């Protein structure tokens, strides 16, 4: 599939809105073009699956507990991890513009979680979000608050 355009409008609209909903083609592959454009623009991109995250607010902004699977008679343990935003912000290169969290399978997120991502991107200007909300014949995006 030939991609028309350089992806500059995508990066520009993400910088303007802070959070975008993206609809990609069913065969996939075209979103890699936009991932490369974001990296080329100076952003550190983190791709995550939306399935199995749990509480999105605690996962992104506060320390959260993770319980590994118990195999047999092993003890039940809970490991606590720092917030994902702080974890990746600590490893950012000095010249990076910020973080972009790219959520695929975003159709499983509720409206409340999507509005939280919009609010978080407005509060913290160094963090942006791209959420894949569905499939279309050609790739398109729109601000997440209007999706």
UniProtKB/Swiss-Prot annotation:
Keywords: Membrane, NAD, NADP, Plastoquinone, Quinone, Thylakoid, Translocase, Transport. It is found in: Cellular thylakoid membrane. Its EC number is 7.1.1.-. Its main location: membrane. It comes from the Bacteria. GO terms for cellular component: plasma membrane-derived thylakoid membrane. GO terms for molecular function: oxidoreductase activity, acting on NAD(P)H, quinone or similar compound as acceptor; quinone binding. It catalyses: a plastoquinone + NADH + (n+1) H(+)(in) = a plastoquinol + NAD(+) + n H(+)(out); a plastoquinone + NADPH + (n+1) H(+)(in) = a plastoquinol + NADP(+) + n H(+)(out). It is a peripheral membrane protein. NDH-1 can be composed of about 15 different subunits; different subcomplexes with different compositions have been identified which probably have different functions. PANTHER family: NAD(P)H-QUINONE OXIDOREDUCTASE SUBUNIT N, CHLOROPLASTIC. Belongs to the complex I NdhN subunit family. HAMAP family: NDH1_NDH1N. NDH-1 shuttles electrons from an unknown electron donor, via FMN and iron-sulfur (Fe-S) centers, to quinones in the respiratory and/or the photosynthetic chain. The immediate electron acceptor for the enzyme in this species is believed to be plastoquinone. Couples the redox reaction to proton translocation, and thus conserves the redox energy in a proton gradient. Cyanobacterial NDH-1 also plays a role in inorganic carbon-concentration. This is NAD(P)H-quinone oxidoreductase subunit N. It comes from Synechococcus sp. (strain JA-3-3Ab) (Cyanobacteria bacterium Yellowstone A-Prime).
